[in-house]
Amino acid sequence: MHKSQAGRPCENMKKPESYNFNVNPRKPNGLFMGILKTFAAYPDMKRRDFECEYINMDGIKPPYFLLANHASEMDFRILYAAIRPYNMNYVVAIDAMHDNGIGLMRFAGGICKRKFIQDMSLIRNMKYCVDHYKNPICIYPEARYTFDGTQSYIPPSVGKMAKLLKVPVVVLIAQGNFICCPQWNKDKFYKRPAPCKAKLVCVANAEEVQALPAEEINRRIAEVFVYDDFAYQYQNKIALDFKQRARGLHHILYQCCECGTEFEMYSSGTTLECRHCGKKWEMTRYGRLEAHDGNTRFAHIPDWFRWERENVRAEVEAGTYCIEDEVEVHTLPKNKYFAQGRGKFRQDSTGTHFSCKYYGEDFEMHLAPNQLESVHIEFDYRDRKKREFFGDCLDISKHDDSFWLHPVN
């Protein structure tokens, strides 16, 4: 983990204005989006030999409810290429609004939200776009980037949202967007031109949405919402010769599958190693792992990642799971980060807990397991506006602010 370097604590400061989620979203500006797609999205997709398969899409026109997998910075380019020539309104997290500018993101049709909180204004804003702008309305139902190139949990509320919108439900599954730009190795992704493919599938038309129960809509979504980008790479023999392709892999493969030691893994170049037992693996051009000693337990990276999650689940069920650390805290109420100094973070089988000074006042947050379905994690995060280095972090939100927690140890 890296220590945060951004800003001094704001003591005795009045809490800044929070983002107003009640403001109506804007219709995407046609001229602006036309320029952006023509000179950025479409050329890059052409360079990556983009192809999209359309399934059950005959007669399906906007507005529709579009659910897409979330893998990398490539996602929006793929989206616009797949739904060409339409523009869309889309749900975007407040940190992305901050990084790219609130005005610009709203100009492009963005609908701001905070991650993993119940938000009635989001429902109202999505319904407003469907009723007034007649565009596709897009969400990333996983609500975070995939770390291993496979699908994540999708909440059952998605089916209920579809029933409320009363428009067709369409799923976009992209491939190749993760292997060229995994979240633990994002630098120079332009130099990794993996071919990108996608399929756009209508899982329920407007009449079916109104007739089917939310549970059946969720079942249809889950049936289609399946992907594995490392398998896609290996099966299609997509060779990525990037010399630092394994760098950062230890962020997700943090537990040695040979000796079981946690947080002593290291990666650089094309090599992953355990500094406790000395075991080493090579990450091949095709995204596979090969042990230097010839004894490879997990050649497929998602299998190793799944094994780690199963270990954590066993700890939770046994009541022994616990992670605790001192953290540096930054808050993001609207479009600027504010340093809050040091705090304490703990997650165990009882839930997620942290405390800190919050604009000069003592603050605590306690969330039971059923109150927080997931957390958003960033590796080597930077405040793009100030070009300041935050390091590894996670963020947890309440309705009027977001807390970015940077583990110190």
Q: What is the predicted role of each segment?
A:
Residues 33-70:
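Helix-to-loop junction immediately C-terminal to a conserved catalytic motif
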Residues 61-118, 166:
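Catalytic core of membrane glycerolipid acyltransferases/transacylases, capturing the structured
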Residues 63-65, 136-140, 170:
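Residue-level preference for the first positions of well-ordered beta-strands
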Residues 66, 346-384:
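Phosphoinositide-dependent membrane-docking surfaces
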Residues 135, 147-215, 219, 240-260, ...:
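A cross-family acyltransferase "interaction/gating" segment
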Residues 263-266, 283-284:
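Short, non-ligating residues that shape and space the ligands of small metal-coordination modules
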Residues 280-360:
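Long, charge-rich boundary regions
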Residues 373-409:
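Acidic, Ser/Thr- and proline-rich intrinsically disordered linker/docking segments
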